[in-house]
Curated annotation (Swiss-Prot):
Residues 134-183 form the bHLH domain. One of its GO terms (molecular function) is protein dimerization activity. It comes from Arabidopsis thaliana (Mouse-ear cress). GO terms for cellular component: nucleus. SUPFAM superfamilies: HLH, helix-loop-helix DNA-binding domain (SSF47459). The gene is BHLH52. This is Transcription factor bHLH52. Its main location: nucleus. Homodimer. Expressed constitutively in roots, leaves, stems, and flowers. SMART domains: HLH (SM00353). One of its GO terms (biological process) is regulation of DNA-templated transcription.
Amino acid sequence: MIIPETDSFFFQEQPQHQPLYPDEALSPSLFGFDHYDHFYESFLPSQEIFLPSPKTRVFNESQELDSFHTPKHQKLIDSSFHFNSHDPFSPSPESNYLLDSYITEASNISKFQAPDFSSTFKVGWTEQGDTKKRELSAQSIAARKRRRRITEKTQELGKLIPGSQKHNTAEMFNAAAKYVKFLQAQIEILQLKQTKMQTLDSSKVGREMQFLLGSQEIQEKLSTEEVCVVPREMVQVLKAEECILTNPKISRDINKLLSTNLMN
């Protein structure tokens, strides 16, 4: 059997396939798509942003950092993976540095201890040796003296007003105002008595008025009811006065007083 020379290519040594490198594995020229480069490149994202450069090597591939022996054909993943600073979701070396700084600061804060303050706080007191003295301002001292003087004068006024021991401070001042009015009216009556009853025998009337006005209980009753003591003889003399007769209201009040048995 004669083999034609044209068929001798079946016995020719086939070329040995070379391993494809990462940059040649996906090359369009391998499949005869060179004339489609301008077509599919428009649909692919920018390599600068999303596809890392295979020659960019961020990690150190020294044997000291590798715990296991890695075959050469697996370096495709190692060499092609790198951090993309433009991708917000990819990790960055700065994030590891910030995390280490935060952990260091947090550990320092956890070691901080607040000073131990006393739970008691005293205002206006100072400690000098074993004794404690209160610090007072000039205004506080003046106010304390003023309150002390008011208290002393109030106690002295209460001794002069009949029945003041039965009242509180406000009621005592009200009773004091009425008592002052009673004294003023009683003094005017006594002065008028001296001018109107000079010709009458007023010795008996004078003794009776002295007895009445000398009693604390009677003074309290008179000042509370806002009235004063007037002798009957003096009222009868005033009734005949022309100024009283010309004033119907005063004349009516005098007749009312004379009709009662309260006045002597």
